[in-house]
Amino acid sequence: MEDFVRQCFNPIIVELAEKAMKEYGEDPKIETNKFAAICTHLEVCFMYSDFHFIDERGESIIVESGDPNALLKHRFEIIEGRDRTMAWTVVNSICNTTGVEKPKFLPDLYDYKENRFVEIGVTRREVHIYYLEKANKIKSEKTHIHIFSFTGEEMATKADYTLDEESRARIKTRLFTIRQEMASRGLWDSFVSPREAKKQLKKDLKLQEPCAGLPTKVSHRTSPALKTLEPMWMDSNRTAALRASFLKCPKK
């Protein structure tokens, strides 16, 4: 799974996921399913945000990478992926500026057009079950919830899906392709089932004991489908901004 994650996701996303796990004392090399889940969630958050801007009239518009956008403001503020201290600083700043109610839990995004925080969910289960879990945890009508599944289903607060159909289709296609690639490598079942994940972890640990450090065949193989998985959706200008604002790791 670790090899798959490093091949499948943008290096910035992988780096952010590793940083987030280490912040909570978790090891991406051991908790590989969680590593994959965090990367997937981060990517969906970025895809949700990318190419969506607000023009000088306050209207929401979509601008593809490469188009002039100097006078445009990003519609969404990305909160997910930052360390907790910085994330709360951003949330507090938004609340002080806009007057919106401060959430009890860290949200994933802030929507400047609708003036609301957004909680993004990516589930391997039924969307309505995961939606209810999120709603029961947050217990706030002020935070908008939007859930995606790997099967193409989605659910949002008051059926308000925020984004246009094409943008949501891009996210659904990406999730479905990730699922297909995992399945083709025999990783999907363990990703979905905790029991299977534990069995797979035991197998992995046994395999690592006699040949620790040796590269696996998977790490040297990139399927044609994975080439299409390369996240070309990331706006090059925003990629640089993300690296600058999110990754503040001390140099070794």
UniProtKB/Swiss-Prot annotation:
Keyword set includes Nucleotide-binding: no
Keyword list, A-Z: Decay of host mRNAs by virus, Eukaryotic host gene expression shutoff by virus, Host cytoplasm, Host gene expression shutoff by virus, Host mRNA suppression by virus, Host nucleus, Host-virus interaction
Database matches in InterPro entries: PA/PA-X (IPR001009), PA/PA-X_sf (IPR038372)
Superkingdom in the source lineage: Viruses
Described function: Plays a major role in the shutoff of the host protein expression by cleaving mRNAs probably via an endonuclease activity. This host shutoff allows the virus to escape from the host antiviral response. Hijacks host RNA splicing machinery to selectively target host RNAs containing introns for destruction. This may explain the preferential degradation of RNAs that have undergone co- or post-transcriptional processing.
Listed GO biological process terms: viral RNA genome replication; viral translational frameshifting
Name this polypeptide is given: Protein PA-X
